[in-house]
């Protein structure tokens, strides 16, 4: 497989994550699992077959350290409290981010993949939620997913889309900015329809911080 084809496939997977994160049941798990599996296989080939040395930037080292610290903290908590080791399942998944860093350093994700897939995902999520609520008569959108998760994921999509909208505004790409703002509104409507309130608590602080950082 050629490098450009492999890079394209990775970009499509990343875009697919934002588009399917709520639309599919456990959509937030499928793409990360596939990417995690690919990254582990690539890391094994990279280190043991080709015997390459990974040159880490300082920021990457701190990020990897934070992942390891997070995992070790959970491990110590389980050992001290004598909890079931099944509790380590979710925290252990964060370790998959380490080989992902290697994978994305060799096959970079294009910035446009993020800039457009996030608002598209926000819009698809919002339109699906509105259809389920007002056309299908669901009490809450995405009933197969816990409503707190739905609300928080939707707010995250709205926040990311808001940052992207500001970016496009600064770049004077106003059509793309409007597109992103529509994604913001639709994602926020999803969160509102879900009935979850947790994500809304920190939203004003996050938005004000973003505006402060982009004040120039």
Which stretches of residues belong to each language-model region?
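Transmembrane signal-anchor hairpin modules in multi-pass inner-membrane enzymes, especially those
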Residues: 1-75, 109, 116, 166-177, ...
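Juxtamembrane membrane-water interface segments that cap and precede transmembrane helices
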Residues: 14-18, 135-144
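Juxtamembrane "helix-exit" motif on the non-cytosolic side of transmembrane helices
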Residues: 74-82, 130-139
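Aromatic-anchored transmembrane helix interface
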Residues: 62-72, 82-104, 113, 117, ...
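Hydrophobic alpha-helical transmembrane segments
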Residues: 18-26, 76-81, 103-104, 187-194, ...
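A cytosolic-side transmembrane-helix exit/cap motif
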Residues: 53-59, 85-88, 108-114, 136-141
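Alpha-helical transmembrane segments of multi-pass inner-membrane proteins
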Residues: 39-40, 96, 109-137, 148-216
């Amino acid at each position: 497989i050629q490098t450009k084809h492999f890079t394209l496939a990775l970009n499509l997977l990343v875009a697919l994550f934002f588009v399917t994160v709520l639309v599919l049941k456990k959509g937030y798990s499928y793409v990360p699992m596939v990417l995690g599996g690919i990254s582990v296989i690539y890391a094994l080939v990279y280190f043991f077959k080709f015997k390459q040395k990974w040159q880490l930037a300082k920021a990457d080292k701190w990020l990897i350290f934070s992942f390891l610290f997070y995992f070790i903290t959970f491990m110590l908590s389980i050992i001290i409290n004598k909890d079931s080791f099944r509790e380590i399942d979710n925290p252990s998944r964060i370790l998959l981010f380490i080989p992902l860093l290697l994978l994305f350093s060799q096959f970079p994700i294009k910035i446009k993949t993020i800039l457009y897939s996030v608002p598209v995902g926000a819009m698809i999520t919002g339109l699906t939620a509105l259809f389920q609520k007002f056309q299908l008569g669901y009490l809450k959108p995405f009933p197969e997913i816990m409503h707190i998760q739905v609300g928080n994921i939707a707010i995250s999509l709205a926040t990311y889309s808001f940052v992207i909208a500001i970016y496009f505004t600064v770049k004077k790409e106003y059509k793309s900015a409007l597109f992103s703002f529509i994604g913001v509104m639709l994602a926020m409507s999803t969160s509102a329809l879900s009935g979850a309130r947790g994500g809304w608590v920190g939203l004003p602080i996050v938005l004000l911080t973003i505006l402060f950082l982009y004040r120039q």
